[in-house]
Design a protein with these regions (language model features):
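Basic helix-turn-helix/winged-helix DNA-binding cores
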Residues: 2-111
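Intrinsically disordered, low-complexity, charge-dense segments enriched in Lys/Arg
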Residues: 106-109, 113-189
Length: 189
């Protein structure tokens, strides 16, 4: 049970981290920023997502590559608008699961004719609810595994828990990719 108690603590910490890491629209600077300012803002605000303190969330090269590959819209006279920052936040959240090519297809389809601030506000609203669901679901898995008499030890329960979580993540990833593929097919017509 000790390992599962640690999982509870990790889950509580994750809940707090996810809650603390949401960057509200009001927190995004309402002025145009130079590259270094964008990097400082994003790396500071997304710091909780690092697994290793030495990691960088964003680098100058990464952002330049996003612009070059047209995933991120070009800066205006070397300055990045609040909308650029929102795009970079969405890229950060999505690139954990999707390829940059998939993100580009999605952005090309979705962002051109829509208000980016409204999209991001809606994203934040829905992810708040989703984080609550995820926490509840993981707690449910933990309870099921704790009560499963066929599972003999914590190591096995931990393996099964992680396997369930990755299976669900893979299913969501696959569904997201299929949706993007359908957007690409519609766009190619």
């Amino acid at each position: 049970m000790e390992v599962f108690m640690n999982i509870q603590k990790i889950l509580e910490l994750t809940d707090k981290t996810l809650d603390d890491c949401k960057i509200e629209i009001s927190e995004i600077p309402n002025i145009n920023l130079y590259m270094e300012q964008v990097l400082t803002f994003l790396n500071d605000e997304l710091d909780e997502f690092k697994r290793d303190p030495k990691d960088k969330i964003y680098t100058k090269s990464m952002i330049n590559n996003y612009v070059k590959s047209q995933v991120l819209s070009k800066p205006d006279n070397k300055k990045y608008t609040p909308n650029h920052v929102i795009e970079l936040l969405l890229i950060f959240y999505m690139k954990q699961i999707l390829s940059l090519d998939d993100i580009k297809i999605l952005f090309d389809y979705s962002l051109a004719n829509n208000n980016l601030r409204e999209i991001y506000a809606s994203y934040l609203n829905h992810t708040n609810n989703e984080y609550l669901n995820v926490s509840s679901e993981i707690n449910n898995y933990i309870n099921i595994l704790q009560n499963d008499e066929e599972l003999k030890n914590d190591e096995t329960k931990t393996l099964i828990l992680i396997s369930l979580l990755t299976a669900k993540a893979n299913a969501y990833k696959m569904f997201s990719e299929k949706l993007i593929d359908s957007l690409k097919k519609d766009n190619d017509k």
